[in-house]
């Protein structure tokens, strides 16, 4: 029977080291892990203390890491990476997005290998962008090949770097995050912004799919990846209810009690403003969460309206 690695199973707390711990997912996951009885520390480029969390400085670009950072660590959760939606995708920025993920993963593996650290698991973020940003009606699962666009390339190279841990005999889990729903610092907060003018807006033709997930469910998936010793490989972290952008905005309007402006933001406007990055908004895939649910995972928020109501009105 597979071992369930809950923090309470041991006399000493199991230790989780998180990269990107100050980001959206990292903050929520840290709280979840602490509440679940784990010891949590962060790797940060600044090394600035974050409440009760011990923070170790690292700088993968110059291959520096605090020598004490990995002492006694049982799990690494790797979330760090340059924000995909923060800046326009110049050639330089696109390189930063890839290198911040791939090189940091390779550096972590090098340090773990050289020091002979025995991890219980290495858990890395990825994204449903692995499948590319096509406008097809295909439902993608973990057996599908990566997309041939930029986001597909980013995720492919990131996951290949993560597989270095698997090749070293360390249980490796790659979590392909969907669009994370959270009120203050997520894609949802941007979609809600027009509401201050009294309405919501659609973008493009509205037919693009939005593989979404509530932040609570996403943190629970990462917790499962830590606890369940037979969980390995890639998993799509998206809610089972598949919706288009137009459907999403309609439900959001209903929850917020705001009308949807009848004229969408034209695709050419977004392409002019955002360049290639507009594809993230204008295209999207249907993504299956069947493999995850087959592990026994139960979503707390499988329904979009319930998820939005909890986040906005809860």
What is the predicted function of each stretch?
Residues 192-200, 208-242:
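Alpha-helical substrate-binding/gating segment
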Residues 156, 168-170, 180-190, 225-235:
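Glycine/proline-rich active-site loop of Rossmann-fold NAD(P)-dependent oxidoreductases
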Residues 126, 160-183:
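Conserved beta-loop-beta element that borders a ligand/cofactor-binding pocket
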Residues 10, 228-276, 309-314:
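Mid/C-terminal beta-alpha module of Rossmann-like enzyme folds, strongest
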Residues 56-104:
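NAD(P)H-binding glycine-rich loop region in Rossmannoid oxidoreductase-like domains
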Residues 1-10, 14, 279-314:
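C-terminal amphipathic/interface module of NAD(P)-dependent oxidoreductases
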Residues 106-149:
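Conserved Rossmann-fold NAD(P)-dependent oxidoreductase catalytic core, especially the SDR/UDP-sugar
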Residues 14-36:
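N-terminal Rossmann NAD(P)H-binding glycine-rich loop of SDR-like oxidoreductase domains
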